[in-house]
Amino acid sequence: FVVSTTMAFAWPGISPYAYCLNNPIKVIDPDGRNPIYDADGNFLGTDDLGLQGNYYVMDKGGFTQGMSHLEAGNHAIMGDLPAEIAKKIGIHYADLPNRPDYDGFVTIQEGIDWAKSHPYALQNPTPDNALYIDAAQLDFGHLSTSNFAETGIATPVNLFNVSNTIGSLGNPRLMATIYALGRVDMMLLNREQRTVRVVNGNATAYDWNQGGGAVRNSCIMLNNVIFNINPKVHGFRANYYGVGVLRK
């Protein structure tokens, strides 16, 4: 690779041009997280560990958004890239820290700003106009393992409820979670560990369309007036990765 890593500051004793510490067999990703590009240098998305860290390059056909980190490594293309492809990736990669989702968490204002700066993104979704959100950083409020009859099964849940709404006052992380997700499918992974995954789909789109009850519709209408949101224009795809943990 001929492009230095923007994370070079994290390893001051290592050359910024030393891809995988010069040992891609044993150290495919020193930071443990990474964006993914195809062999033509196009951004594809992320594995289950997010945007940060050194990038992978793989054939587009082997990529699935949110795929496991191990699986992504198994599909990675080893060896040097053509200079023009490496440059293309390097330019895009260097700009990733400027994205609001680079840290894995998106505030309400960041979501609104992204929607306004990317009109019609939901109608024309691309890896670049989507946001990538880490489930580990979400607060699911009063949702508990008792809301899931089985593990490993997509289960519809309603995060926008009275107890969570009250609990979100003074808790911006919970407020951002219920604002973004509302009614959504989730999966309980381990009952003892209280681990869950957000099931990506139409319900995880970051939008302001009405539906799902009079209270929700009233809140959305008020929100759209306050923030000048046009639901026909504003909205984007949100891809949730990683594993979240319930409070109980």
Q: What is each residue range found by the language model?
A:
Residues 1-76:
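Short turn/helix-capping motifs enriched in Asx and small/polar residues
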Residues 37-38, 45-48, 75, 80, ...:
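Catalytic toxin/effector domains delivered as secreted proteins or via bacterial secretion systems
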